[in-house]
C-alpha cells in the first residue's frame, strides 16, 4: 500500500508550528484551520488526503464517509477516542497516533498526583487561601516504604515506576503484554491482579480503555484492596468505575483519589470533583509545551516518512501494515496481492477457506502482513471497490465469505528448486494452488497446481496476464492463440510455459490489455483465465 500520492494535509487543531514546517519541508501542502464545524471540516477535506488532529476535532463516521480523498488521519497524542476507528478502517483510512509524544508529561503528572495525595497539598492550599491554618487536619503520609501498584507497564507506566522508586516506593504491577523479565529490568515485580489489590498503598492505572479494562477498579476490586488505598487515574476515564470510587471514598475504603480524566469530559456529575478527598484536573496529562511540541513533531515526521516510503510508525488500526514498509517485506506484499488476484480470476471469486503458507526462515513471522495483501488481491476486482487495501482487508474478509488461514513451514521443499522462500496461496478443498517467490525485488509466479515455470513468470503491477492449460503436443495451438489475440487487437508481449504436469502444460502470455471475452479460447484449451493487479 503506497501513500506517495498523499499531497495535502489539513491540520484542524492547534499544534506547534514545527508540525507544519516539517510537513512542508517534506514536500506536503499544509492547510491550518481550527474550530471547524462538521460541515466546514468535511468541506476542507474534499481536497485533502491527510488530516492531523489533537483531541478537539471529532472525526466521526459522517466526516470519514464524506471525505472522498482522505487516506490518513494522524492524532498528535496517544488516545484516539475522537476518531471513529471502525468507520476509518472500513473505508481503508489509516489512523496513526504518537504513543510516546506525551509519555513523559503524563508520567510526571501522575507522580505529582501521588505526591499531592500523600501530603494533601491542594486541600492545604485551598485552606490557606481561605485564611485558615490547619496543620492537624492535613496530616500526610510518607511515600518511602509504601507499595505502588502500576496497572499497565508501557512507556508511561515504566516512567512512573522509575521516578517513584526514587522516593523509596516498592513498585509492583500487571501488564498482560509486557514480559515479567522486562518489567523486572525497570524494578517492577509483576503479579496477578488478585494478588496486587491487597498489597497496594497506592494504585495508578496506565492502560488503554478497552472492554477488558473498563471498570478495572470496581466495587469488587475495591473490596479486595487494603483499607485506605489511594488511587490515581491519568489514563482514560472509565478505567476506574466512578460510582464504585465514590462509594469507596464514602466508606473510607479509599483514602483519596487523584483524577485527570473522567468518563464524561467535562463531568456533569460533580460528586467526585467536589469530594474533599479527590484531587482533580481537566485532563492535563499532555498539557505541557514540551509534550505538544513533541507530539506535533512526531506526527509530522511519521507523515513524511510514510509518504517517502521510509517507515510506518504509530499505526492504530492496521499494525500488520507496519511490516509492509520493510525493504524485505515490500516485494512479498506485492507478490501476495498478485497471487490473491490470480486466485480470484482462476477460481471465479472463491468462497470458503483460503490457505496462505509461507516457506523459508526469513518469512517466519510474515503471515500476518501477507494475508491481508492476499485478501486485497482477492477482493479488489471482485468487489469493484477501489478502497480495498491493507487497512480494511481483514474487516472485509468475513463479509466476502472468506476465511483466510496462515501457516509457516521453516524450510522450502527441495523439489521447488534452489530458492529459500516461497509463498503459497490455495483454496482449501479445491484444485487451485499458486506458488510464488521473490527474485531480488521482483514478484514471480513459480508454479500452478504443481506445474513449475522455469524460468519463473514475472508478476508486474498493471501488466495483464493470460493463463491457459492445454495438451503440450498440439503444434497448431500457439499460432491459433496468437491469431485470437490479433482478432481482439491485443498485443502479445511475452510467452512462457510450465513443465508438463498431469499430461498438460500451463501457458502464460503477457498481453497489452485484458481480452473482452475468453469464449473463443475455450474450445482450444482445458481452462483459461486472465488477470492483472
From Swiss-Prot:
NAD(+) binds at residues 78, 155-156, 175, 207, 234-236, 260, 283-286. The modification Phosphothreonine is found at residue 78. Keywords: Acetylation, Amino-acid biosynthesis, NAD, Oxidoreductase, Phosphoprotein, Serine biosynthesis. GO terms for biological process: L-serine biosynthetic process. The modification N-acetylalanine is found at residue 2. It catalyses: (2R)-3-phosphoglycerate + NAD(+) = 3-phosphooxypyruvate + NADH + H(+); (R)-2-hydroxyglutarate + NAD(+) = 2-oxoglutarate + NADH + H(+); (S)-malate + NAD(+) = oxaloacetate + NADH + H(+). It is an enzyme of class 1 (oxidoreductase). CDD domains: PGDH_4. Pathway: Amino-acid biosynthesis; L-serine biosynthesis; L-serine from 3-phospho-D-glycerate: step 1/3. This is D-3-phosphoglycerate dehydrogenase. Its EC number is 1.1.1.95, 1.1.1.399, 1.1.1.37. Catalyzes the reversible oxidation of 3-phospho-D-glycerate to 3-phosphonooxypyruvate, the first step of the phosphorylated L-serine biosynthesis pathway. Also catalyzes the reversible oxidation of 2-hydroxyglutarate to 2-oxoglutarate and the reversible oxidation of (S)-malate to oxaloacetate. Belongs to the D-isomer specific 2-hydroxyacid dehydrogenase family. Homotetramer. GO terms for molecular function: L-malate dehydrogenase (NAD+) activity; NAD binding; phosphoglycerate dehydrogenase activity. It holds the Pfam family 2-Hacid_dh_C. The modification N6-acetyllysine is found at residue 58. It comes from Sus scrofa (Pig). The active site is at residues 236, 265, 283. The modification Phosphoserine is found at residue 14. InterPro entries: ASB_dom_sf, D-isomer_2_OHA_DH_cat_dom, D-isomer_DH_CS, D-isomer_DH_CS1, D-isomer_DH_NAD-bd, NAD(P)-bd_dom_sf, PGDH, PGDH_ASB_dom. It comes from the Eukaryota.
Amino acid at each position: 500500500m503506497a501513500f506517495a500520492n498523499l499531497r495535502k494535509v489539513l491540520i484542524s487543531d492547534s499544534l506547534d508550528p514545527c508540525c507544519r514546517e516539517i510537513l512542508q519541508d517534506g514536500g506536503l501542502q499544509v492547510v491550518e484551520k481550527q474550530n471547524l464545524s462538521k460541515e466546514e471540516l468535511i468541506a476542507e477535506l474534499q481536497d485533502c488526503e491527510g488530516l492531523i488532529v489533537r483531541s478537539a476535532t471529532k472525526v466521526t463516521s459522517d466526516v470519514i464517509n464524506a471525505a472522498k480523498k482522505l487516506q490518513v488521519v494522524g492524532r498528535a497524542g496517544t488516545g484516539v477516542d475522537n476518531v471513529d476507528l471502525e468507520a476509518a478502517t472500513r473505508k481503508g483510512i489509516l489512523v496513526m497516533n504518537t504513543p510516546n509524544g506525551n509519555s513523559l508529561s503524563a508520567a510526571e503528572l501522575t507522580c505529582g498526583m501521588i505526591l499531592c495525595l500523600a501530603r494533601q497539598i491542594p486541600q492545604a492550599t485551598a485552606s490557606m487561601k481561605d485564611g485558615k491554618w490547619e496543620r492537624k487536619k492535613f496530616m500526610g503520609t510518607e511515600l518511602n516504604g509504601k507499595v505502588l501498584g502500576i496497572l499497565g507497564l508501557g512507556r508511561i507506566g515504566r516512567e512512573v515506576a522509575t521516578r517513584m522508586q526514587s522516593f523509596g516506593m516498592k513498585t509492583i504491577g500487571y501488564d498482560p503484554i509486557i514480559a515479567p523479565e522486562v518489567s523486572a529490568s525497570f524494578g517492577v515485580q509483576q503479579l496477578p491482579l488478585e494478588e496486587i489489590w491487597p498489597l497496594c498503598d497506592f494504585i495508578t492505572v496506565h492502560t488503554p480503555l478497552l472492554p477488558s479494562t473498563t471498570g478495572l477498579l470496581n466495587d469488587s476490586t475495591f473490596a479486595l484492596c487494603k483499607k485506605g488505598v489511594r488511587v490515581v487515574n491519568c489514563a482514560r476515564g472509565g478505567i476506574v468505575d466512578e460510582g464504585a470510587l465514590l462509594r469507596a471514598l464514602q466508606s473510607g475504603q479509599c483514602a483519596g483519589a487523584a483524577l485527570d480524566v473522567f468518563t464524561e469530559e467535562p463531568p456533569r456529575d460533580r460528586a467526585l470533583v467536589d469530594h474533599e478527598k479527590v484531587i482533580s484536573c481537566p485532563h492535563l496529562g499532555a498539557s505541557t509545551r514540551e509534550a505538544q511540541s513533541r507530539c506535533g513533531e512526531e506526527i509530522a515526521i511519521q507523515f513524511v516518512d510514510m509518504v517517502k516510503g521510509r517507515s510506518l510508525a504509530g499505526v492504530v488500526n492496521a499494525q500488520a501494515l507496519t511490516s509492509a514498509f520493510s525493504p524485505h517485506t515490500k516485494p512479498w506484499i506485492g507478490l501476495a496481492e498478485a497471487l490473491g488476484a490470480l486466485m480470484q480470476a482462476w477460481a471465479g471469486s472463491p468462497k470458503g477457506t483460503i490457505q496462505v503458507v509461507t516457506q523459508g526462515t526469513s518469512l517466519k513471522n510474515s503471515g500476518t502482513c501477507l494475508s491481508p495483501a492476499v485478501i486485497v488481491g482477492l477482493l479488489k476486482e471482485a468487489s469493484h471497490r477501489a478502497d480495498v487495501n491493507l487497512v480494511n482487508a481483514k474487516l472485509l474478509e468475513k463479509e466476502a465469505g472468506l476465511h483466510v488461514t496462515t501457516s509457516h513451514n521453516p524450510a522450502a521443499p527441495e523439489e521447488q528448486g534452489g530458492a529459500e522462500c516461497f509463498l503459497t496461496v490455495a483454496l482449501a478443498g479445491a484444485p487451485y494452488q499458486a506458488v510464488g517467490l521473490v527474485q531480488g525485488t521482483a514478484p514471480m509466479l513459480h508454479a500452478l497446481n504443481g506445474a513449475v515455470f522455469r524460468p519463473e513468470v514475472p508478476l508486474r503491477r498493471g501488466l495483464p496476464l493470460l493463463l491457459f492449460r492445454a495438451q503440450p503436443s498440439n503444434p497448431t495451438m500457439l499460432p491459433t492463440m496468437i491469431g485470437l489475440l490479433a482478432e481482439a487487437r491485443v498485443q502479445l508481449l511475452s510467452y512462457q510455459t510450465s513443465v508438463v504436469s498431469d499430461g498438460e502444460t500451463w501457458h502464460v502470455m503477457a498481453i497489452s490489455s485484458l481480452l473482452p471475452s475468453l469464449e473463443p479460447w475455450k474450445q482450444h484449451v482445458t481452462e483459461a483465465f486472465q488477470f492483472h493487479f
